[in-house]
Amino acid sequence: MTQANLSETLFKPRFKHPETSTLVRRFNHGAQPPVQSALDGKTIPHWYRMINRLMWIWRGIDPREILDVQARIVMSDAERTDDDLYDTVIGYRGGNWIYEWATQAMVWQQKACAEEDPQLSGRHWLHAATLYNIAAYPHLKGDDLAEQAQALSNRAYEEAAQRLPGTMRQMEFTVPGGAPITGFLHMPKGDGPFPTVLMCGGLDAMQTDYYSLYERYFAPRGIAMLTIDMPSVGFSSKWKLTQDSSLLHQHVLKALPNVPWVDHTRVAAFGFRFGANVAVRLAYLESPRLKAVACLGPVVHTLLSDFKCQQQVPEMYLDVLASRLGMHDASDEALRVELNRYSLKVQGLLGRRCPTPMLSGYWKNDPFSPEEDSRLITSSSADGKLLEIPFNPVYRNFDKGLQEITGWIEKRLC
């Protein structure tokens, strides 16, 4: 089946699809606080979703392209779930968030098919994959159109990987008690087995969102990167996120001695946002299998246990948390009680001495991850490093922070 035909088949209208902002029906909605964060973007009046320009640009999207798609959404006069929120157009049609970003992705998909130069074609496929992922953002459970966009993103990513430098292998991992999961192993040029970083991504991202991290930071150092989706999304959608948040990643770690391209004696974990919750759990529970753990903007305690901190978080992010936990109809109070159980301090891990070297990077006044969380991580480690990343200039400091983190990982792996 051609890519064009696949797109037509997946998005063929069958029934009135639920609109993304209606999927989580929490009560006690409060006033929306203005929020700005390097990793999550910022709240903009009249938008349900946080607009995450830094990360989208970092993944290769032109700022003008972002504005063009936003303009098409704003200009639509189609019916909306909430007339005050631009990105709540109902149905797969002009003005709908998923429709507009997927339409933009199809433009790059067509460019990729028409391009004769393999590397340039690969770049176009990667661009399309990223746009499909933005279409599916924030990846709420039960969002049928978003899941179809994710399927197209994965297809485009596989096409890109065949044409871009290095090697990518799609791998299946068995997890007892449930469905197997699929991961992507990205390998640099040269002969393996390679030192490898196991990526633990944020809850509002897909595993295919981290190619830039591999290409710009790990591959030049001869380090491979292995990704899997977080529980309840993408290839891990059949698994619910539980208090044992590191379950899937633990089974992947245990399988690495059987993967010939990975040097299982030289493995580190890198966690973004809630992915740091997974990575730090691994540092405690699987320390013999890990040389190091690095975290960026970790969500390990405060956001999960502090009501005041939760009040500062946008509705969309609370919806993401509720969706991952399978609490689509929960009150804020019920969600708060459940989130507290995910705190690694409440679980009795953080605060205990951990033999695994751990680095944690943070931004001052980050509403999702205060400095205290990073200090808690690094002070618990026998070899801890605290890294403050200045906010402005945001893109340059983000790059500088990642260079420092990957250099720290390299010293412990190579």
Swiss-Prot record:
Keywords: Hydrolase, Serine esterase
Entry-linked InterPro entries: AB_hydrolase_fold, FrsA, FrsA-like, FrsA_esterase
GO molecular function: carboxylesterase activity
Catalytic activity: a carboxylic ester + H2O = an alcohol + a carboxylate + H(+)
Enzyme Commission number(s) of this protein: 3.1.1.1
Gene3D superfamilies: alpha/beta hydrolase
The family this protein is said to belong to: Belongs to the FrsA family.
NCBIfam families for the chain: PRK05077.1
Function text: Catalyzes the hydrolysis of esters.
Descriptive protein name: Esterase FrsA
